[in-house]
Curated annotation (Swiss-Prot):
This is Peptide-N(4)-(N-acetyl-beta-glucosaminyl)asparagine amidase. InterPro entries: Papain-like_cys_pep_sf (IPR038765), PNGase (IPR050883), Transglutaminase-like (IPR002931). GO terms for biological process: glycoprotein catabolic process. The active site is at C185 (nucleophile), H212, D229. It comes from the Eukaryota. Its cofactor is Zn(2+). Binds 1 zinc ion per subunit. The gene is PNG1. Specifically deglycosylates the denatured form of N-linked glycoproteins in the cytoplasm and assists their proteasome-mediated degradation. Cleaves the beta-aspartyl-glucosamine (GlcNAc) of the glycan and the amide side chain of Asn, converting Asn to Asp. Prefers proteins containing high-mannose over those bearing complex type oligosaccharides. Can recognize misfolded proteins in the endoplasmic reticulum that are exported to the cytosol to be destroyed and deglycosylate them, while it has no activity toward native proteins.
Length: 353
C-alpha cells in the first residue's frame, strides 16, 4: 500500500468514526428528554391521528415478538412442502445463497394464498353449508367465547333458505386465526406477518389509512425493504395500489419492534388524498420519538446499523418518480384487486376503475 493509499484509508476510517459518533449522539442525546416527552404527550392529546398512530404502535410493534407463537406456526405449516419448493426454485434459477430468503418469501406467499388461508366474503351457513343464501343482518358485540381471541366485532348474517343465523367473528388473535384459516385483508396480514417472523425473517406490518394492510420484508439480497401482499401473492410490487388498483391513499405507515416510519412515498404515486390529518413536522416527530422509544435499550452497534438502514430508506423514498423505481411492479398487469368480491372491491375503490 502506498503512502497516499494509507493516508486515504486513515482519513476514511476517521471520517466513518466521526459519522458514527454523530449518529449515536443524535439518537442518544435527546432520547427520553423531558422536552420531547412533553411535546409527545401534548400531541397525542390534541391530535386524533397522532392518538391513532400511538394506538397502532402499542398494538403492532410487539405483537409478533413471541417465541411460543413461532413454534405453533412451524408445527402447523407444511415445512416439507415449503422447503422442497424453495430448493427446487433455487436450483432451477441457479440462485446464490444470498437470494435464498427471497425465494423462501415467494414460496410462503404462494403457500399461504393457495394452500393454507382462505378468503371470506361471507361465511358459510352452518346448516346449508354455503354462503349463497346469506344476507347481511348487522354487527354484534363479541360473546364471552369470541372475546377470548381479541374479537373487535362480529358480523351477523341470516340464511334466507334455512333461517339460521351465522356469526363471523373478526378475530385479531393470530393463533386463533391459524385455526380458522379464513378472513379478509386484516386477518390475512395478521397471520402472514407472524409466519414471516416465525421463519426468522425481518418483517414489518404496513398500515394504510384508507383501510388496507400488508407487509414488508428486509431482503439481504436486495438490501432494502420489499413490499409483500399475501392477499395478492405479490412480491415487490409497491405501486399496485395506486396504479393497478387505482386506489386513493393519504398515509402509509410501517410498524415493527425497532421502527415506526412513514413509507407513503413508496406506495403513493397517483390519486393522492390530502395529508391534512397531522402536519408533516409533527408526523416526523411522532415516528422518530416512537422509534427512539423502541430502540432505547439497543447497544451502539445496533443503533448505528439501524440508523444507516433508515437513512438508506429515506433516500430511496425521495425518489418518487416511476422512472427511478427499482421494484418489479407490473404497471401494465392485471387491472384492479384480485382478492375479494366484485361488489366489495368496487365499494372500497380498489377495482381499478
Amino acid at each position: 500500500m502506498t503512502d497516499f493509499q494509507e493516508t486515504l484509508s486513515s482519513v476514511s476510517k476517521r471520517f466513518l468514526e466521526l459519522y458514527r459518533s454523530k449518529i449515536l449522539s443524535q439518537w442518544r442525546g435527546t432520547n427520553g428528554s423531558s422536552e420531547e416527552e412533553k411535546r409527545f404527550n401534548s400531541l397525542i392529546q390534541q391530535n386524533g391521528f397522532a392518538r391513532q398512530i400511538f394506538g397502532l404502535y402499542k398494538s403492532l410493534c410487539f405483537r409478533y415478538e413471541n417465541d411460543a407463537w413461532y413454534s405453533v406456526v412451524l408445527d402447523i405449516l407444511d415445512l416439507d412442502l415449503i422447503y422442497s419448493n424453495v430448493d427446487k426454485a433455487v436450483q432451477d434459477n441457479n440462485a446464490s445463497d444470498i437470494e435464498y430468503q427471497d425465494y423462501l418469501v415467494k414460496e410462503l406467499l404462494r403457500y399461504f394464498k393457495r394452500d393454507f388461508f382462505s378468503w371470506c366474503n361471507k361465511p358459510n351457513c352452518s346448516k346449508c353449508g354455503t354462503d349463497e343464501h346469506l344476507e347481511w343482518v348487522g354487527t354484534d358485540r363479541a360473546n364471552s367465547e369470541e372475546a377470548k381471541y381479541q374479537c373487535g366485532n362480529v358480523e351477523v348474517y341470516r340464511c334466507t333458505l334455512t333461517g339460521d343465523i351465522t356469526r363471523f367473528p373478526r378475530y385479531n388473535d393470530p393463533i386463533k386465526l391459524l385455526q380458522t384459516r379464513t378472513g379478509r385483508c386484516g386477518e390475512w396480514c395478521n397471520v402472514f406477518t407472524l409466519i414471516l417472523k416465525s421463519f426468522g425473517l425481518n418483517a414489518r406490518y404496513i398500515w394504510n389509512k384508507e383501510d388496507h394492510v400488508w407487509c414488508e420484508y428486509y431482503s439481504p439480497n436486495l438490501k432494502r425493504w420489499v413490499h409483500l401482499d399475501c392477499c395478492e401473492q405479490s412480491f415487490d410490487e409497491p405501486h399496485i395500489y395506486s396504479k393497478n388498483w387505482n386506489k386513493k391513499m393519504s398515509y402509509v405507515l410501517a410498524f415493527s419492534n425497532d421502527i415506526v416510519a412513514d413509507v407513503s412515498g413508496r406506495y403513493i404515486l397517483q390519486n393522492n388524498l390530502p395529508r391534512n390529518a397531522i402536519s408533516e413536522n409533527e408526523l416526523n416527530f411522532m415516528c422518530t420519538y416512537l422509534t427512539k422509544t423502541l430502540r432505547k435499550d439497543f447497544n451502539d452497534d445496533q443503533i448505528y446499523a439501524l440508523a444507516c438502514r433508515d437513512e438508506q430508506e429515506r433516500l430511496s423514498l425521495e425518489k418518487t418518480k416511476p422512472s427511478k423505481d427499482t421494484s418489479t411492479t407490473t404497471l401494465t398487469g392485471t387491472k384492479g384487486r384480485e382478492s375479494g368480491s366484485t361488489a366489495w372491491k368496487q365499494q372500497r375503490g380498489e377495482d381499478g376503475s
